[in-house]
Amino acid sequence: MYRLLCLFCFSGLLVQSQVQQLDEVVLSAQRLKSDIQPLSATIVSDSLNLNFTQEIGGLLQQIPSLFVSSQQNFTQDTRIAIRGYGARATFGIRGIKVLLDGIPITTPDGQTQLDHIPLSQIGTIEVLRGLSSGLYGNASGGVISLQSAPIISETNIAVALGDFQSQSLMAQWSKAQEKNRFRAIVAHQKQHGYREWSGFENTLVSLSNEFDLKNSSTLNIDYSFFNSPYAYDAGGLTLTQVNENRKQARQANLNYNAGERVQQHQLSARLETKNWQSYAFYTRRQLDARLPFVYGGQIDLGRDYFGLGTQTSGTKNKWLWQYGIESAAQHDARIRFENNMGAKGEETLHQNERFYSLGAYGITEFSYLDWRLRTALRADMHRITLTDFLDTNTGKKDLAAVSPSIAIHREFSRFFSSYVRWGTGFETPSLNELSANPSGKTGFNNALEPQKSSETELGILFRKKKFDASLTFFYTKTKNEILPFELETFPGQNFYKNIGQTTRKGIELEGNWQFAISGNLTFSYSRGHYQTETKKELPNVPKHQFATTLQQHIGKSTLALHTRSVGARFADNENKVPVPHFWTADVTIKHNWRKSALVIGVNNIADTQYFDNIRINAFGGRFYEPAATRQAFLRVVVSF
């Protein structure tokens, strides 16, 4: 639930993030250790420092076809959509696989919350656009892979203040010895929020330990604790209410005390040898939420999520390969109560939901002269079970999928290459989506089916010493697309249905130009159509996006300008409610002095009025969550 404060306090680093040339590094997100990338990919890094950057959405806004929203709603979390996948998310990220050092953060049913990850420890972020179920299985409409920065001996303290009573304190201490490296991060944030009833407070602790073993093996053990005692939800407004007072909260959200309390523990371990990599993890998350309606308006959700995986890689002559197996389980204990104006009432739902996943995959790559042929095949089995303690709707559902992909890459010269790729994807309904039964009864909505997709992609890459660019065309078909809707009898609650076949087609352009020793410009543009069988555009997916980042070093200071243009989109399935285009610009100045740094900046310097989030198909026209206007911030970082 890192949100608006992160944009205030850490934009000085966000706008300095750069897109590396794809031939400079090996993408860990593609699993195979190859020096070519026959797929649309972007690597976000920072030549200065990613320390104390917390809001992942701000780091990713320059990536084509990737749309970030709900960055200022501390209850619903940042939402990220890649080529339209993830746009329907109600809370957090949906339909996109997220990894931290190779360990899945995404649950088996396809949901992701990033509030427990201290991005101050992240060194690079890799993003794969397009279907990736052949690599990662369920709900892989794209991949976001977070890689931790190497642990070195250092101590950092950062203090930040900003508009809307934003406060942040972060401390990091790390020690690197010959065969052991340790890092500890503590962060605390608090903010009143731009809108009424939109504040939050949270604390995070992260511990990382890395051991060097025999035979060049390494063992990593990580633990994180996250606690948010409160995060309030201001709710969606009608356009009339926005025009009257864009800072106001929806009255029902005030009446029902809408918001949440979250606590999470996560423990993970990774073992890497020359040819083998294995991992295991366990996560415990407790959510107590209050929604703005009576029946089922209070939620007590206890989630246990755990898994393990192992993979082996090898090479011989002109072949590369990797084979692996992964297993994960998700146990949700879901209880709902009446919400009597913020007070807990009678129990309306009590059920245990289980999601078990087992997958095996293989990836091979064959090289011949300037050609590369890569294939991937993955098989997944899922079992979903429900135990209903209030009624007789106990049951189970078994799902399976086989996901192939193939890509051909051609290196025409050291400056120019191209590729063509075909891949598949599948996405099961999440436990939250299944448990939202529009009949009003307990149990799952058994009418909801998985969505399945296939995609063709053509890419062209050009790279020189001071300039690189890529151009990508994609075409995707999806069957049984899942979208949310609301009912008059349950206003504010999302239900889900399959709407039939959809198509996604578009073009993506991105580039990086070092126009001087001290100056750099990155840019990206994407344009696409995301349509149903009736030629209606999918809601909350912009038709086009354009972003630039201009960075200039002047002595010990850095001036950065980040601009973002987001095209028009729709708030409903029938395309009767248009959401207008908007443009924003952020300016940041950073000055380094010895081991300290001072950052001063202004976000949304043009004072643009736009919407941070759109509630898809909201009943009563309450689609709109206004974004903050102009904001100033100050941050001080001291290193020892």
What are these regions (language model features)?
Residues 315-318, 367, 474-477, 495-572, ...:
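Gram-negative outer-membrane beta-barrel transporters
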Residues 23-51, 76-81, 96:
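N-terminal periplasmic "start-of-domain" segments of outer-membrane beta-barrel proteins
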Residues 124, 131-133, 143, 147-175, ...:
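Short strand-turn segments of transmembrane beta-barrel domains in outer membranes
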Residues 96, 103-129:
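Short acidic/polar hinge/loop motifs at secondary-structure boundaries
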Residues 240, 329-340, 381-388, 396, ...:
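Surface-exposed extracellular loop regions of Gram-negative outer-membrane beta-barrel proteins
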Residues 163-190, 195-233, 258-274, 314-316, ...:
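Transmembrane beta-barrel wall of Gram-negative outer-membrane proteins
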Residues 301-312, 355-361, 445-449, 455, ...:
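Outer membrane beta-barrel strand-and-loop segments of large Gram-negative receptors
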Residues 479, 565-570, 590-640:
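C-terminal beta-signal and adjacent terminal beta-strands/loops
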